[in-house]
Amino acid sequence: DHLDYHGNLASYEKAKKRILMAKQKISYETDPYKLFEWITESKPKKIKFNNLPYRYEIISSNVVNDSKSTNYHSLSHALKKAKHSFKKSKYSLIVCGDPKKEGYRNIKVDGPEKIYMFGSYAKNINKCIEHPKKIIVNSLDDALNQIYENTRPNNILFSPGYPSGNDFKNYSERGKYFNLKLGKYLSKWK
């Protein structure tokens, strides 16, 4: 304990105040990697953090899986990020899920060239989203096929914008399903 070492509170305070007296800077360096190298005389290993699965996960240079997007706010955030991810080029948005859990909120979507809607709630989503080019498809396969056949470049943002509803158990299952279906198209797009 500190008081055992210093004997009493006055000695403890005196020792701590001495730290402030020695405030001459020995380095103006603030980069933690350079400081580590300076102190340990070895180079630190750079740590790379990967995105968590299905949270704006970059699958390839032209595909983003944001299955975790389960509400208006996360969809809006993904749309803002997509402008930079796709370097301001055209992209398609794929949405699905149950808009009831978002209160059938009307959403004006800016950014994507086309919006593809699939699943048992596609017609309800169609009523909620304002965009000039909305396309209801029967399945995720149909959406991916239409994007592959009719859209160049094949940039895709999968950001459902709604909770899974009855179509999927949760966002994780939905994200895995997207990656599985996407697999057969990725080799064609390269």
PLM regions with names:
Residues 1, 70, 98-100, 121, ...:
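Short glycine-rich anion-binding loops that position phosphate/pyrophosphate groups of nucleotides
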Residues 1-28, 164-172:
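Flexible active-site lid/hinge loop adjacent to a nucleotide/diphosphate
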Residues 5, 74-75, 103-105, 126-128, ...:
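Short glycine-/acidic-enriched loop or helix-start segments at secondary-structure transitions
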Residues 11-13, 105-111, 171-178:
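Charged helix-capping and loop-helix junction motifs
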Residues 12, 66, 93, 115, ...:
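Residue-level signal for inorganic ion chemistry
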Residues 31-114:
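Nucleotide phosphate-binding/pyrophosphate-handling subdomain across enzymes
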Residues 99-155, 190:
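C-terminal helical cap/extension that packs against the catalytic core
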Residues 160-188:
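Glycine/aspartate-rich loop-and-adjacent alpha/beta segment that forms the canonical ThDP
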